[in-house]
């Protein structure tokens, strides 16, 4: 479930901006400039939050032609982190992410549709736990501009909800925990 969340969020976040020209960006994951977080209901009483600490990706964006934007993200599934060592070990097992067999999750965009007001729907193929399914990330442009180090940056955020069984995650967590929400924020540095 964590793989889904990361891939979906990172890819969705990268395609919504307001850039005046086409440009390619590398996702800057240092210093929490980008993250792929997830949350899932814990027994229906609260939220269990987690993140993926190791991922890479890039995106291209042209505000004048958002439909030509592209996003690619690869997440290392063993980097799942819920701040609880035993739970993280279980999430890495074949009950959930099966990191020994599927060490990465990937997202590759297939289309971007502007929905107005700096938002877009990013559709793409998410491969998680050895299963590839189309997902839609609701993305929003945050901002862009020069940074203090001579570079140029653009930022996006996005979210999607994944159904665990769609990605062959069969562990029964109860009726309140059949889906996981992915929350993605990315800042890209223009190449």
Curated annotation (Swiss-Prot):
Residues 1-22 form the signal peptide. The keyword Ribosomal protein does not apply. Pfam families: YceI. Belongs to the UPF0312 family. Type 1 subfamily. PANTHER family: PROTEIN YCEI. Keywords: Periplasm, Signal. InterPro entries: Lipid/polyisoprenoid-bd_YceI (IPR007372), TTHA0802/YceI-like_sf (IPR036761), UPF0312/YceI (IPR023480). GO terms for cellular component: periplasmic space. It is found in: Periplasm. This is UPF0312 protein PST_3941.
């Amino acid at each position: 479930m964590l793989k889904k969340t990361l891939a979906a969020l990172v890819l969705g976040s990268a395609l919504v901006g307001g850039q005046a020209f086409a440009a390619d960006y590398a996702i800057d994951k240092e210093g929490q400039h980008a993250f792929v977080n997830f949350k899932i209901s814990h027994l229906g009483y609260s939220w269990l939050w987690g993140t993926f600490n190791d991922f890479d990706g890039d995106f291209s964006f042209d505000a004048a032609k958002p439909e030509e934007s592209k996003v690619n993200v690869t997440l290392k599934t063993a980097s799942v982190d819920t701040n609880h060592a035993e739970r993280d070990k279980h999430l890495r097992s074949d009950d959930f992410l099966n990191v020994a067999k599927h060490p990465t999750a990937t997202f590759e965009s297939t289309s971007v549709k502007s929905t107005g007001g700096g938002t877009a729907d990013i559709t793409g193929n998410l491969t998680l736990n050895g299963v590839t399914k189309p997902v839609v990330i609701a993305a929003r442009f945050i901002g862009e501009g020069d940074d203090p180090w001579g570079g140029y940056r653009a930022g996006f955020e996005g979210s999607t909800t994944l159904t665990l069984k769609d990605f062959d995650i069969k562990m029964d967590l109860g009726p309140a925990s059949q889906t996981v929400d992915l929350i993605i924020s990315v800042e890209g540095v223009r190449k």
